[in-house]
Amino acid sequence: MAPAGLLQTSLIWVAYGVAVALVLLVSVITTLTWQTPHERSIAVSIVSIISLTALLATVFLLPVDIALVSSTASAHLGAKKDWATPGRVDGILLTLKIVYYTLYTLDALLCLIVIPFTYFWFEEYDEVEEEEGTSSAAARIWRALKYTLGFVFLVVILFLIGFFVPAAGNNPGKHMDLDYFKRLLAANNGEKALTFGVGLLITLGTLLYILYTSAGLALLPVSFIKSAPSISAPQLSATTASALEHNRELQRQLEMRNSGRPEGMSQKDRREMDALLREERTLVRRERLAAEARGDNRSKIYRAWTKVEAVFRPLKLLGGIFLLLLAILIWVSMLITGIDKAANSICKQHCGYILGHLNVFQPINWIFVQSAKAFPVDYILMALLVLLFFSSSITGLATIGIRFLWVRIFQLKKGRTAPQALLIATVLLGPHDPRHQLRGRHARGAAVRHLRHADLLRQPAAATRASSPTAASTATWCAPAPRPSASPAAIGRLHADRHVHLPQPRPPSNWPRLRRPSTSGPSSSSSPSSSSSSSPASSRTPRLNLSELDEEAEVDERGGPAGPAPAAALARPGAISPAAPRRTPPRRARRVMARRLGTRMGVGRARGVKLNGGAATENDKKEKKNGTWVWAWVWEWEWQTDWLAE
């Protein structure tokens, strides 16, 4: 029987290794796809890839924990298998514990030191100083290190609060003598400080979980249902070609009308010509985008992928409907469990509303229990559920953006995400802690009041299914069920499980208010998903936002050197080509320009800025309403002023 157990545990670890390799590939693709190519940094890309890989590896370790621990016991009886001797079980737990502590330590180092240092290091880069040679790598590293040390100092203060405050509150005497510090160390307050720090991060992660994941659960299925090509290439190409031909005809008429005048164009005609030239630049950009959407000058692989994507469009629609139903099912399960906890918890808020057993039918729990009859199905479902929550968090981040209260600091878009936004998004995803509940093949102890952990493992009759009722619902103390898990104590102590009933000598947490609400607890966290998912927006055809399209194309052209001009732009003699090569303006120079124009970061729209003076024509007013006319003046101002040389 020993080779069978060794084979099963080895297969679990091999599956985990394959999952981590796939996670690494997904992290690389995600980072390179979302990051803007104009401000791409090798250091930021590497740190983002490593952080996402470590985060997802930590998340996917939870199903591995469930699978390894459950493999030592019979799925039908709850008794230990013959090969699961205490030595083998201890070896499995030791391996799991090493992996747990390694990943959690790596996550902590990345979130508290590496990512802040990379963020400040990237912020300290200045292209003007680099060209002038006034900035050195050592000075840049030192400035970034100063800000990072300040951030670490704040984290240390939080740990000191967790170290001193609880013990000081329990000891009203003197607090500054040597005996007091000895008592602190003897009382294992170092672990309590770690518990406080992790609990604080998990509490913040829960708020992010409620804000971003709940919105993502609604928006992810809707995006699948409403998804359409970002640009309707044939329609946009035909419309743009017609508008461009009409525009150039109007320009030709103006030129012919003023060709015989010795004083040149009148002021009115010049304003109209300027408006037509701005409109021409916009139409040329749209024509270029339509050509890119059609796959012109693209590889055969790209065009083949576009055709395959169009063929599988109905399956994508069905997948969106399935995800929508799944999101509603998850919300219903969370609502049921929240009501069950509020009504039937024995110890109420004193232990985090823990349940001795389920009193109301819970659909998600029933699915896990039934899927446990086929060996790997329940673990695959657990991994897919975790992946769904993680994908929903990313969708919520991309939709809502990185905000402070109502102020949007960064926006996440494919191919347009700033490196700083990528690093902050990685940190925001870090505190997400989708802990599993004891569902499916988890074995737990029956109602034996003073039975210790080791005694429970030796008595198969005392183990029952995680979903079965228990007679211990009248117990007065609620504590985590004795399960041989390798999850770190400081983290496991913060998670009050719902299938628990045995007494424990000490309270489960030094900071009971910082317990992580269980996945089925905060039913309000996903309530927006049901209201948003049932909105009429899910049945409307996506509309093409031309003003946003023009703005993004303008940013692309301003962000780097452009390629050769489209043939349509050079068809008429004297046409203005928007594709003249130009250098990438440095971030600090763009900020100077933003302050002069009243824009935000040199990319936002200026309000009431018109650099050539004069009254706006009717076309100007229409274009101002769409937010496009300001860009033409910003573009001309950049060409007419030599601010790069300053």
From Swiss-Prot:
Superkingdom classification of source: Eukaryota
Keywords: Cobalamin, Cobalt, Glycoprotein, Lysosome, Membrane, Transmembrane, Transmembrane helix, Transport
Compartments, record wording: Lysosome membrane
One Pfam family matching this protein: LMBR1
Membrane topology: Multi-pass membrane protein
GO MF terms, alphabetically ordered: cobalamin binding
BP-aspect Gene Ontology terms: protein localization to vacuole
Entry annotated with the keyword Glycosyltransferase: no
Carbohydrate-modified residues: N297, N545, N626
GO cellular component: vacuolar membrane
Membrane spanning residue stretches: 11-31, 42-62, 102-122, 149-169, 193-213, 317-337, 380-400
Region (Disordered) location: 459-588, 603-623
Keyword Membrane attached: yes
Compositionally biased tracts (Low complexity): 460-490, 517-543, 565-582
Cystine crosslinks: none
Principal subcellular localization: membrane
Protein role: Probable lysosomal cobalamin transporter. Required to export cobalamin from lysosomes allowing its conversion to cofactors.
Family to which this protein belongs: Belongs to the LIMR family. LMBRD1 subfamily.
Protein's name according to its UniProt entry: Probable lysosomal cobalamin transporter
Species annotation: Chaetomium globosum (strain ATCC 6205 / CBS 148.51 / DSM 1962 / NBRC 6347 / NRRL 1970)
